[in-house]
């Protein structure tokens, strides 16, 4: 829903100029937004014949209008003065400042070019919609910067964009935490003063959660398809690059990806292999020779584009799964996951200390904090000659932990996985999904202990009957594992959940930021 709504809003201003052909000019921020959202073919449908970055050197196309989709007015004045295009339609990712508009107007009036600017709009679409139920702000280093007031201001504008796009004024819930409380207060004020969202009969609840609430989940080994993909290949803006060099764009409209992104890896492999088998059967049934009936030939031709798309999808996921299996074997990811989630013996720990990368062992050591085996951490790290400032951070801040799960060996049958353990957890929760479940339960019970409710409409209480959806936003970064557990919660409580965060973290990136914070102390 969120992704489609954002796309509709952007398409509306792309087609707005009364001209069948136009140029699209972006900056680095809006390129981040539009890249995973719209294909080149969709831009073509909006009449976009070419698109450029505002920082690029360009030749004049003086008889063609240009639609600008930018974060700020930087570079616009130079383009108009250079008379690159016939008309300029300016659209800002959030809102343009008065100072920028005045500066632009002054510069253009001196040359008599003010009328070239045909429209200026604040669009409030400043977020990256990766899936219909997931968005990110793409703010790199947000865990390091999450206590910076300048970072809060940028977050507020982007999170507000989500609710402008949804067309709903949120109730804002902050946990007893200074960062989320300050941000909630700023967001409430901004929504009230801007007044761009109309109140409806149902409203979303925005739950702001600091990454400091749970610093363990980002370093745990993972086992669901999207989380594992992000861990192994750094899934960035729905795009991954395999070790083989192959690059894949993961389209949320791709049925295989849409159905399986949050599934456990063994289940995904089984489904992909089954899909491949079904595709081969379909192709065999549609084989054509000189004796084939004309009607059958026509049906085959009509079906060809769909089959080609299906073939591309199956082959992509086979390639991805195959390489993931090899990396799982190489680093013994299945063993690390089993030990972290299902318990372990000392012998298993000793054996595991000789497997995986140094980063895998460091992650395991962090998971042993606050357990009966904490005394094994230093010998474990010394054995691998691992030195990291991060371990001290987790000694001080490791508090909240994901619960241990019962795990079982599944009955999944798959040849592709070979001897990789086919683990399927019995249940899975994260501290954030547990927190959200508690908050929703408190709202239903009208209990607000430890919660602060902010509302630009002035209400101090929330009733479950007026909630349209829950929007959970992670300040300082989020994970695909948390998305999975929130979607499981969605099934339990029957309320739609959208998950967003300042950035999507994997263990490597989070550990890098933890070390960065330690260096600042």
From Swiss-Prot:
Pfam families found in the cross-reference section:
Sec1
Q: Which GO terms describe its biological process?
A: protein transport; vesicle-mediated transport
InterPro entries per the UniProt record, alphabetical: Sec-1-like_dom1, Sec-1-like_dom3a, Sec1-like, Sec1-like_dom2, Sec1-like_sf
UniProt keyword terms in alphabetical order: Cytoplasm, Endoplasmic reticulum, ER-Golgi transport, Golgi apparatus, Membrane, Protein transport, Transport
- The secretion signal range is none
- According to its record, what are the GO cellular component terms? endoplasmic reticulum membrane; Golgi cisterna membrane
Bilayer topology reads:
Peripheral membrane protein
The protein's location, in the record's own words, is: Cytoplasm; Endoplasmic reticulum membrane; Golgi apparatus, Golgi stack membrane
Q: Which Gene3D superfamilies match?
A: 1.25.40.60, 3.40.50.1910, 3.40.50.2060, Syntaxin Binding Protein 1, Chain A, domain 2
Provide the function of this protein. Involved in vesicular transport between the endoplasmic reticulum and the Golgi.
Per its UniProt record, what PANTHER family does this chain match? VESICLE PROTEIN SORTING-ASSOCIATED
Instruction: Say which family it is in.
Output: Belongs to the STXBP/unc-18/SEC1 family.
Name the UniProt record assigns to this protein: SEC1 family transport protein SLY1
Which organism encodes this protein? Encephalitozoon cuniculi (strain GB-M1) (Microsporidian parasite)
What gene, per UniProt, encodes this protein?
SLY1
